């Protein structure tokens, strides 16, 4: 199952975030969910949404997976990409932080249960 959220970032821009979890799992308001937050936000490329055995296995073990589509990526077109590159790159980082804070504020997880992942250029989001 999944839920789609639009997270307000530092400048009011709404950042799309999809949250995936095992069917039948209640993720609302318990703050006990282990969450893996992933982002990329670079080169105008989309965060991969294809089948991923690691994410699937994690969900089967009770993890919640959150994909943050931060500025710099290609999920919302060229303007979205431009808003997260070069002198606008801080928007990518601030979008990712906003998504993490949102998951905590909405009581989906607790700071001690939140992990972050970014590969390749997405690693700068979590460094």
Protein language model features and the residues they cover:
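Cap/lid segment of the alpha/beta-hydrolase catalytic domain
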Residues: 1-119, 125
């Amino acid at each position: 199952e999944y839920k789609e959220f639009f997270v307000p970032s530092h400048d009011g821009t709404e950042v799309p975030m999809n949250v995936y979890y095992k069917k039948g799992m209640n993720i609302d308001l318990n703050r006990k969910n282990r969450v893996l937050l992933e982002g990329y936000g670079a080169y105008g490329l989309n965060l991969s949404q294809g089948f991923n055995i690691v994410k699937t296995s994690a969900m089967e073990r009770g993890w919640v997976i959150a994909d943050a589509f931060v500025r710099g990526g290609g999920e919302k077109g060229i303007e979205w990409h431009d808003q997260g590159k070069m002198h606008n790159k801080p928007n990518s980082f601030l979008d990712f932080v906003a998504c993490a804070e949102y998951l905590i504020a909405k009581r989906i997880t607790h700071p001690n249960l939140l992990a972050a992942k970014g590969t390749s250029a997405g690693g700068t989001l979590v460094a």
